Amino acid sequence: MSNQHTLLSSNLLPVGSNISTWWNFGSMLLACLALQTSTGFFLAIHYTANINLAFSSVTHILRDVPYGWAMQNLHAIGASMFFICIYTHIARGLYYGLYLNKEVWLSGTVLLMLLMATAFFGYVLPWGQMSFWAATVITNLLTAIPYLGTTLTTWFWGGFSINDPTLTRFFALHFLLPFIIISLSTIHIILLHNEGSNNPLGTNPDIDKIPFHPYHSYKDILMITLMITLLFTIMSFSPNLFNDPENFTKANPLITPQHIKPEWYFLFAYGILRSIPNKLGGTLALLMSIIILTTAPFTHTSYTRPMTFRPLTQVLFWTFITTFITITWTATKPVEPPFVLISQVASTVYFFFFIINPILGWTENKIMMSTN
């Protein structure tokens, strides 16, 4: 038995001994993915993708299906938890220079785009007021594409407005995309384990490695347990914490909500979109707010990998995080002064992070060289 245990331990993936709690969010994301897939499957059994029945079918799930309320709330709150984890995961990658593992970073960026698409399609499915109008506003951005825009939008909608065919295809895509995400997540993990995890100091992890189990696996289990505890606490005491009050009303194309906005986890991108008065410019800025992450591995100029020992870049990083929160906040506000100006300034600072970061890295190199 002892020999078997030794054999098992020697085959487990060795990991750097000093990786911190920030490295636990990957496993938390896997737990979120498993939760969303399982609860989503049970919801899909009872859901009806028809504009006349969709809203009623969600009400039926909440009222009549045994534990349907738990499934629906877990799925809705789980989506928010998913994005909290993924934004933390990305911030950790930016702070500790993990983007230098190019294949992992680029596959992760593709995963983020797929996740955002999946969440958007899912938000439309209950066919509430905000679902309908958010879908109308966002899909209408396709018309900004020169020459092909109107044709693409009509093809995407399945008609000349958002209607029954749109809801049907959104449901089909919302059901299909998670399986693509699972496949890509597997590739993401394989690519990570090809090189191995980095650490907070940015030193060579081969110097001091320990088996993943039990040292890091128990840490993963602890963080997943805390996340699930928080998830169930919100579900039990404040299930509608992340819901929009407008979405408790059935979609009505004749009544426009006073302030159209998507779910909170899209507000930073929506805020950037709104800050530019031109439709095509706003659409490009919206896309670039995600795509710009792919530039990080190619613009790294510092001799040191993480920001742990780079005070100037740390100030820039926390300015970037504050900017992200500011854009999210302004996107919840109406399009009027002073929110428009705040949003425009914050959006500019958001993109400036990716321009100033390599310049600061080069400056810090010069300072280090001069002190030596």
Swiss-Prot record:
Main location as per UniProt: mitochondrion
Matching PANTHER family: CYTOCHROME B
Q: How does it assemble?
A: The cytochrome bc1 complex contains 3 respiratory subunits (MT-CYB, CYC1 and UQCRFS1), 2 core proteins (UQCRC1 and UQCRC2) and probably 6 low-molecular weight proteins.
Q: Name the Gene3D superfamilies for this protein.
A: Cytochrome Bc1 Complex, Chain C
Supply the alphabetized keyword list.
Answer: Electron transport, Heme, Iron, Membrane, Metal-binding, Mitochondrion, Mitochondrion inner membrane, Respiratory chain, Transmembrane, Transmembrane helix, Transport, Ubiquinone
Where along this sequence does the record place binding of a ubiquinone? H193
Query: Which regions span the lipid bilayer?
Result: 25-45, 69-90, 105-125, 170-190, 218-238, 280-300, 312-332, 339-358
Task: Give the protein name, as stated in the record.
Answer: Cytochrome b
What does the UniProt entry say about where the protein is found?
A: Mitochondrion inner membrane
Q: What cellular component GO annotations does this protein have?
A: mitochondrial inner membrane; respiratory chain complex III
Q: Which note does the record give on the cofactor?
A: Binds 2 heme b groups non-covalently.
- Amino-acid positions noted as binding heme b b566 in the UniProt annotation, renumbered to this chain: H89, H188
Top-level taxon of origin: Eukaryota
Which cofactor does the UniProt annotation name?
Answer: heme b
The protein's job, in short, is:
Component of the ubiquinol-cytochrome c reductase complex (complex III or cytochrome b-c1 complex) that is part of the mitochondrial respiratory chain. The b-c1 complex mediates electron transfer from ubiquinol to cytochrome c. Contributes to the generation of a proton gradient across the mitochondrial membrane that is then used for ATP synthesis.
What GO terms in the biological process aspect are recorded for it?
mitochondrial electron transport, ubiquinol to cytochrome c
Give the family this protein belongs to, as stated in its UniProt record: Belongs to the cytochrome b family.
A Gene Ontology molecular function term for this protein is: metal ion binding
The organism encoding this protein is: Aspidomorphus muelleri
For whether the record's keyword set contains Ribonucleoprotein, the answer is: no
